[in-house]
UniProtKB/Swiss-Prot annotation:
Keywords: Cytoplasm, RNA-binding, Transposable element. It comes from Saccharomyces cerevisiae (strain ATCC 204508 / S288c) (Baker's yeast). Residues 1-86, 364-397, 419-438 are annotated as: Disordered. The gene is TY2A-LR1. Residues 1-11, 19-39, 49-60 have a biased composition (Polar residues). Homotrimer. This is Transposon Ty2-LR1 Gag polyprotein. Retrotransposons are mobile genetic entities that are able to replicate via an RNA intermediate and a reverse transcription step. In contrast to retroviruses, retrotransposons are non-infectious, lack an envelope and remain intracellular. Ty2 retrotransposons belong to the copia elements (pseudoviridae). Pfam families: TYA.
Length: 438
């Protein structure tokens, strides 16, 4: 009866054999599948006895390897082959552009023979494999007890980054290199390589490893064809074909220069002048901005500079707009000269212009405030009393008296002058004043 059931269900043989093998130690020279069917009940009886002694049961490593035996239990995941990094498949640039890359993890997996031996700038093959970009895992070694369940755990990165990093677009022209390098630097920063990229001052936080250098070199070539690079980049790579960091450092410096150019353009477009500062200071400011733009190969014509300056004039300088509106040949030096002339004229007029309201210095207000009272009492004293404080009637009397006295004196003086002149002309004698007789 039992043999018929075994023939009807042959898989039960493997199940019974597996239970007996895993629960009882078997000699290394004996195949667990070679046990006859007649001895199966005996193995089953032994297995019930051994199940109560699980503490002394050996591990699965005691079971000899058998290629014909398929175990229903999943095999344990082997430890990583390269330290803390795990092996990942390679991907071509076309696949990388179609789907987001993962983060930087295993740069040593790249084939870097050309990086070590190539005498010139290497042109990558369109199907050149590029690694996945996965962040570094934790440096702590895995616990050997948890190796069985390692396949179900998700490795955690050191830093919080996105799940995917979008690769930079391929460089299409030499003029777009300054824009492309911004995306490439952002691509490296999002991939946990920002600490090896030079900052605005050309400083880096740490030295990059050989694998990181190889990765930067290969990704730079994959997305920046050599014939589309600017001349200054080609000159650097002709000296040292792998000196990508120097290219990035100078690119960052040029970005700062471009930012200064933008600031200069904004300052030139928003010029304002109303005479509150000297004309010389205004001229120096404008000339410095124009000269700085010229050093960066940006020439500002006199006509454009004059239009921007005239737009910002106000006050007494505003009428210069109408004067230069019909002019076709504008000279910046001439405009500065006219601004200086108006500024000097206004300065002279302000010095000679009398004040509309005279300040009476003879009056002095003295305010006294009592600290104990809330009301403020103001007392005005006239320390210098003048004639202006007399009543109007007294003023009129004094004026009439003084005018009458002046007329009498003037008539007397005129009469005596005429008589003395008449005597001197006729008799040529000088009269002495009469003296009183005693």
């Amino acid at each position: 009866m039992e043999s018929q059931q075994l023939h009807q269900n042959p898989h039960s043989l493997h199940g019974s054999a597996y239970a007996s093998v895993t629960s009882k130690e078997v000699p290394s020279n004996q195949d667990p599948l070679a046990v006859s069917a007649s001895n199966l009940p005996e193995f089953d009886r032994d297995s019930t006895k051994v199940n109560s002694q699980q503490e002394t049961t050996p591990g699965t490593s005691a079971v000899p390897e058998n290629h014909h035996h398929v175990s229903p239990q999943p095999a344990s995941v082997p430890p990583p082959q390269n330290g803390q990094y795990q092996q990942h498949g390679m991907m071509t640039p076309n696949k990388a552009m179609a789907s987001n890359w993962a983060h930087y993890q295993q740069p040593s997996m790249m084939t870097c023979s050309h990086y070590q031996t190539s005498p010139a700038y290497y042109q990558p093959d369109p199907h050149y494999p590029l690694p996945q970009y996965i962040p570094p895992l934790s440096t702590s070694s895995p616990d050997p007890i948890d190796l069985k369940n390692q396949h179900s755990e998700i490795p955690q990165a050191k830093t919080k980054v996105g799940n995917n990093v979008l690769p930079p677009h391929t460089l299409t022209s030499e003029e777009n290199f300054s824009t492309w390098v911004k995306f490439y630097i952002r691509f490296l920063k999002n991939s946990n390589l920002g600490d090896i990229i030079p900052n605005d001052q050309g400083e880096i936080k740490r030295q990059m490893t050989y694998e990181e250098h190889a990765y930067i070199y290969n990704t730079f070539q994959a997305f920046a064809p050599f014939h589309l690079l600017p001349t200054w980049v080609k000159q650097i790579l002709e000296i040292n074909y792998a000196d990508i960091l120097t290219v990035l450092c100078k690119s960052v410096s040029k970005m700062q220069t471009n930012n200064q150019e933008l600031k200069d353009w904004i300052a030139l477009a928003n010029l304002e002048y109303d005479g509150s500062t000297s004309a010389d200071t205004f001229e120096i400011t404008v000339s410095t901005i124009i000269q700085r733009l010229k050093e960066n190969n940006i020439n500002v014509s006199d006509r454009l500079a004059c239009q921007l300056i005239l737009k910002g004039l106000s006050g007494d300088f505003k009428y210069l707009r109408n004067q230069y509106r019909t002019k076709t040949n504008m000279k910046l030096s001439q405009l500065f000269a006219e601004i200086q002339l108006i500024y000097d004229e206004n300065k002279i007029m302000n010095l000679n212009k009398p004040s509309q309201y005279k300040q009476h210095s003879e009056y002095k207000n003295v305010s006294r405030t009592s600290p104990n009272t809330t009301n403020t009492k103001v007392t005005t004293r006239n320390y210098h009393r003048t004639n202006s404080s007399k009543p109007r009637a007294a003023k009129a009397h004094n004026i009439a008296t003084s005018s009458k006295f002046s007329r009498v004196n003037n008539d007397h003086i005129n009469e005596s002058t005429v008589s003395s002149q008449y005597l001197s002309d006729d008799n040529e004698l000088s009269l002495r004043p009469a003296t009183e007789r005693i």
